[in-house]
């Protein structure tokens, strides 16, 4: 079942949480709402679920207006960050809860409930824990039980609010890949909130970048990473250097360095900022003929397969960060304090707004 929101707005006092947000999610899509704290992503998720009401706009499921439909009638599965499992109930009872509290006319028989719960526990690969209590489970196991409970009511859509936020990094990575495989089996529209860029880019079909209550960009993980639509998206999706220069007729310049600026074909000495990823900066020793930004190597941080270099520009001491493979760094024999040239290889150029 598809999900569509049209012109959603929401205020909490003077704070505007959502500002005319519109979005369409197809059946079977796994979509991430990604952004910093306070950007509106959780508010949007809760309005879709029916846990929050909008000041304006509408929510449609499969083309039908669900804005005024009670949360209990929306057939939405919701998974919270902190599991919200009932401590006094076993795993089996937690998963069965949503089925047992249905109105008598809609409640399955106890035999069907048992079969359904055991099927779901098998689906999340935890059927052997049916008689345990939440306190006896790991964080990853609790989150999978919470997901099984959400699926028990056969939701038309699945909504997850930072489902892996309370887990350590290794478990998060394992669970999000497991969620991707599970989602492909279920084939329902699924939306999850996260502030983890890697998480959103790794497992989703599309990423919705949000900022200050608005959508900045919607696209596939590859699209938003390779072609960020705004400076905010560029900065939020990873480390980035901002180099201030000028653009003229589609070319950005800073000293001897020139880079294409295809989005500014009519610019005439216009102030513009080149956004450059650390791994898109090459290094050369000072005195070579190639153009570059004169810098001095301040510090080197080695982390696994990469070396992260902190470079200070020689004109204004502004910091430029570069990332190179550790074997290359070793072969170059660079020393802290050495004069170098930073050579941006690729960038996205945005005009400075007056």
From Swiss-Prot:
Which keywords appear in this protein's UniProt record, sorted alphabetically?
A: ATP-binding, Cell inner membrane, Cell membrane, Membrane, Nucleotide-binding, Sulfate transport, Translocase, Transport
Output the superkingdom of the source species: Bacteria
Q: What class of enzyme is it?
A: translocase
**What does the record give as EC number?**
7.3.2.3
Any S-S bridges, and between which cysteines?
none
Q: Which N-terminal residues, if any, form the signal peptide?
A: none
Topology of the protein relative to the lipid bilayer: Peripheral membrane protein
- What reaction(s) does this enzyme catalyze? sulfate(out) + ATP + H2O = sulfate(in) + ADP + phosphate + H(+); thiosulfate(out) + ATP + H2O = thiosulfate(in) + ADP + phosphate + H(+)
The ABC transporter domain covers 3-237
Q: Where in the cell is it found?
A: Cell inner membrane
User: Can the keyword NAD be found in this entry's annotation?
Assistant: no
Gene3D superfamilies annotated for this entry? P-loop containing nucleotide triphosphate hydrolases
| GO MF | ABC-type sulfate transporter activity; ABC-type thiosulfate transporter activity; ATP binding; ATP hydrolysis activity
Please name the NCBIfam families in this protein's record. Answer: 3a0106s01
Q: Which family does it belong to?
A: Belongs to the ABC transporter superfamily. Sulfate/tungstate importer (TC 3.A.1.6) family.
The UniProt function text for this chain reads: Part of the ABC transporter complex CysAWTP involved in sulfate/thiosulfate import. Responsible for energy coupling to the transport system.
Please describe the quaternary structure of this protein: The complex is composed of two ATP-binding proteins (CysA), two transmembrane proteins (CysT and CysW) and a solute-binding protein (CysP).
Which protein is depicted? Sulfate/thiosulfate import ATP-binding protein CysA
Supply the gene name. Answer: cysA
